[in-house]
Structure formats: C-alpha cells, structure tokens
Amino acid sequence: SIVNRKDYFNMLKVTLISARKNTSLRLICLYDGKIGDPVYNLLKDFKVEIIIHELPYKKELMEIYSHEWMETELGKDIEYSRIFGTFMRMEIPIIEKEDEYVLYTDMDIIFNDDILLKDLPHPAYLAAAPEFERDTKRMSYFNAGILVMNIQGMRIKYQQFVEMMKKRQRSTSGLFDQGYLNELCFNDMEILPIEYNWKPYWGINGNAKLIHFHGMKPCSNLEEAG
C-alpha cells in the first residue's frame, strides 16, 4: 500500500495528530489493508474506529482502468491498491447507519480548528470546494478530498454509480472516483467554503479550518504529484 511508504505514512500521522489535538471529531476509517500492518497499528494508536471493508467492484475497476489504458491515456501505470483506496469514499453512504451527515477527508490533511456540524453546509447530496480555483463562482469541477455528505441523498447517487460499474462505464468528467462524483453530483452540489479545503499553494490563510496538501505533497516529487 502506498500509505505504508514513509512519506505518506507521516502525512497520515500528521492528519491524526492534528485531528486529535484540534477537534472533537469522531474518527472513522474505512480500511482494506492487512490487520497488524503499520498503518493499521497507527490508526489503533490514535483510537480511530476501523471499519474493515472491501470494494465490491474491484474487478470492474480493473477492467475500466486497465494497465494498457493507463499507460496509453496517462502515460504511467498506477497501483490498483491506490485506486481502490480512493474509491472507498464512494462506499460511505451504504456503510453509515447512524448519522445524517458525514465529513469525509483524505489522509493528507491538517485539522487547524474544530469542525462543527452547525457551521457546515447541510446539502441534499454533498458539499465540496473547488479543485484548483479559489473563486467558487468560477468553479467548474470540485475536489473530492474533503466532502460533506448527506447520507440519504448519496445513497441515490451510489446506486447510479453502481449501475455505471455494471456497464463498465468510465466517467467522462475526470479520473477515477473524483470524476464519477463530479459527473453524478456537480449539478446538485452545494459549495463548501474554501476555508474547509484550503490548499497550501493558495498562500497563508489564518482562517483555514482544514489544510489539504492537494497535488504536490511534502517530500514528494513532481511525478507523484500528477
């Protein structure tokens, strides 16, 4: 798993430290790795609730994003474990049974302040911030690294996504799960204020609640940044 690499492992550790230090959030992780490996043990150390879950459509994804397709279209091959990991967020609506809303984040985040439900949008489906642009009025594509999900609403979108998987239908709105989410949800989404998905390349923002190391990671190289 890519998260077991030292640089990604350390990013996850920073995410967990900042979440525990600066928030009152209940931390939950969907996990498809080996029990007892370093990432699993780190999650346990920070008392994260671990839900063991395997994607039900791995075969479909491997056919949609074949090694040949990735080499031709992307100019590089990507580990399937990395792709499967990002698609885990699609599973949240069918796993969550208690809460109406869920805050999802990637593992390359700094929690700079507490996150309270009353301060967040309450979308019919999901709320997200822009991929690159800071001006939300010009947003043409959202970043899926931080999402506020309406669980009931996203169950509808999940069923639509499953139908696309059955048909081996690749998203026309972008790569991997973020492309599917934009295709299914962009016209129905609400705006998540950029303070909840602040990118370091935008500069310093003392009001940023969540800092997202989007693209270039600390200690990574240009090839890994995509």
Segments and roles (model prediction):
Residues 26-33:
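Short internal beta-strands
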Residues 37-96:
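Active-site-proximal specificity loops/subdomain of glycosyltransferases
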Residues 1-2, 7-14, 62-63, 151-226:
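A glycosyltransferase accessory/donor-loop signature
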Residues 81-141, 148-149:
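GT-A fold catalytic core of metal-dependent nucleotide-sugar glycosyltransferases
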Residues 141-144, 206:
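Short, solvent-exposed loop/turn segments at the edges of secondary structure
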Residues 43-54, 124-127, 207-211:
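Active-site regions of enzymes building and remodeling cell-envelope glycoconjugates
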Residues 18-25:
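Short, acidic, metal-binding catalytic loop of nucleotide-sugar glycosyltransferases
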